[in-house]
Amino acid sequence: MSGIPLEANYLVIGGGAMGMAFTDMLMTGTESTVIMVDRHHQPGGHWNDAYPFVRLHQPSSFYGVNSKKLGSDTIDATGWNKGLYELATNGEVCAYFDQVMQQQFLPSGRVQYFPMCEYRGDQHFGSLVSDAEYDVVATKIVDATYMHVTVPSMRPPPYEVAEGATCVPLNALPRLAGQWDRYVVVGAGKTGMDACLFLLKNGVAPDQIGWVMPRHAWLFDRADIQGGQMFARTLGRWGGETFDAIAESESVDEFFANLSGRGLLLRLDESVQPTMWRCATVTQAELVQLRKINTIIRSGHVQRIEANSIVLDQGTAPTSPTTLHIDCTADGLEKRPATPVFAGRDITLQSLRMCQQVFSAAFIGHIESAYDGEALKNELCMPVPHPDTPLDYLRTVVGNLLNAARWAQDAELQAWLRHSRLDFLNAPDAGGEVDEELAQRLAVAAVAKLQRWLAEVDA
């Protein structure tokens, strides 16, 4: 059955942060028309499904779309983020993207937005709430869903929950907290940390909390990811000190020891070597709080939660019917294989810089708007896949440096980067000069050493 015919220059599949950031560049850099299709009722993607107390894990100042500021560049005066730039709440992020859609995209007359709709392939999509079906004629098809973002509320837990046991996604925590003798957080990533911090912040004693931690993670210090008046520290930590750590190391293990010694990477337990790295950020104050939790369950992944026992890969742990188990095991951003960003009519949005998906989507939008030729556009948009293990840290640093070296050869692109609010490594108002020649020499040496280490590991 044929659907209602539609036509536009671009069909953008997904109205999350990456789809919005890409489309924003088309709106500001071209006269193109766009059809945007999304399963949610409003823009923002997974932010619509996220737990109510979630905040950005990076400053608001370099999140969102390039054309509209998020937040007010306020430095938090209280709380565990004290002294650092503000982190937007879930509600603020959803409202922000809705404003971009309602106040910028739709009034332009160049965007048609179809919420509560599902793309079915072959330039066809349909409504999730009615019988409406649509056929699209579009010059380009943009996949803004390739990163497969998943949060706990989007699916049941990946383990069995027996009768007599209670397990909920952490979305339910504000509603259910206070009704239980104990809490067990399942999942060692940033979502699990947020659940623990929520409980601690609201007065739950550390000895009432258990934490299932199949893998320990390396963490970024959020103080090292700041713009504005703190940008000099950010640049020094991500540039000079990281180069120094590489230069002073003769092996992968020594490199991570040097990163840890400099505080460039943090960990929950100094006695445990992390086997996970997913870009999670934490403040020193948050780390102090998390370390108060002593019941850490390190017996692998949960297989089944019973009324009085948690069955794991390598053993069991006691629980009870009066314990609330909090599922924090969703993958978040998957580690996806790199694929060409530009392939004929298809554009696949991916990260081009370590853990900076929204900046990357805007960058791809700029390249699509300002450059011609598929080969050149792909040369400028080499994916840096989202990480999962510590070795991926090496791979992403190499990807970052190779991309930065290529971008540095293009004066017009450098000018765009300097004025992009989403590029936290090019704070436009920070001032200061960078010795580009020295930085290039250090980067070349760093890439050579990191690639040698990776080759040795893969051999």
What kind of region is each of these model predictions?
Residues 39-96, 170, 212-269:
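Glycine-rich active-site loop/strand segments that organize a redox cofactor
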Residues 200-306, 350-362:
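Dinucleotide-binding/catalytic capping subdomain of oxidoreductase cores
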Residues 197, 296-299, 303-436:
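Glycine-enriched catalytic-core subsegment of oxygenase/oxidase enzymes
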Residues 1-10, 28-32, 147-175, 448, ...:
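Extreme N-terminal leader/targeting segments of oxidoreductases
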Residues 11-13, 134-149, 184-186, 320-331:
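Short hydrophobic core segments
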Residues 77-151, 269-272, 279, 286-312, ...:
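Feature captures the FAD/FMN-dependent oxidoreductase FAD-binding
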Residues 5-36, 183-202:
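N-terminal Rossmann-like FAD-binding beta1-loop-alpha1 element of flavoenzymes
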